[in-house]
Amino acid sequence: MTKKVTINDIASLVGVSKATISYYLNGNMRKMSLETREKIRLAIEETGYQPNKMAQSLVTRDTKTIGVVIADITNPFISSVIKGIHDTCKKYGYTVNFTNSDNDQLIEQENIERLQQQNVSGIILDTVDANSLLIQKLSKKRTVLVDRQSREVTLDTVVSNNRNSTKAFLAEMKKAGYEDIYFVTFPIEGISTREMRYQ
């Protein structure tokens, strides 16, 4: 059975203290030379060392986990958003905990509360209702809205440029000779992205 590589092994291999390795793993490298950083990186890569995420989170108070609350996971558009979130989080060393609200505000609230209890590093929220009281109570520092904008609160928000996209689409339709153009949508009221498309 292969012996598990520890932080002490990496420290011995590189010739630095355990504390230096810990600083590196926690991203605190301001006082560390580029040479030392590279030695540590190579040692970790060569040995396949896996840091203990639980122990790290106790030291840094950062679980390196992003909670994602999706209004409706069956929405075809959201699948590309989910993939983008997953790939970006993975790139920066974060794991992702996805939840589905089934377009139900009570389920959404339960999902958010559960993620907060798990002390996630942050929450990405594709909300059922961007103007609800629930959204107004969320911490601005640890929550990002996606695909819905709130009129009631100011939160970091990531949305498509729906208004310009619709204008560009209509221009192409007219250019192609279409005259009778109909707008078919789910209910518009309260959904910022649909409102922008309609305007």
Describe every region a protein language model picked out.
Residues 183-199:
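Secondary-structure junction motif
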Residues 87-132:
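Central regulatory/effector-binding core of bacterial HTH transcription factors
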Residues 125-168, 188-189:
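Flexible loop/hinge segments that line or gate small-molecule binding clefts
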Residues 156-183, 196:
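Hydrophobic alpha-helical segments within soluble ligand-binding/sensing domains
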Residues 1-63:
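N-terminal helix-turn-helix DNA-binding module of bacterial transcription factors
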Residues 2-6, 45-77, 81-83, 92, ...:
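N-terminal helix-turn-helix/winged-helix DNA-binding helices
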Residues 34-37, 79-83, 167, 194-199:
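Short, surface-exposed alpha-helical segments at coil->helix boundaries
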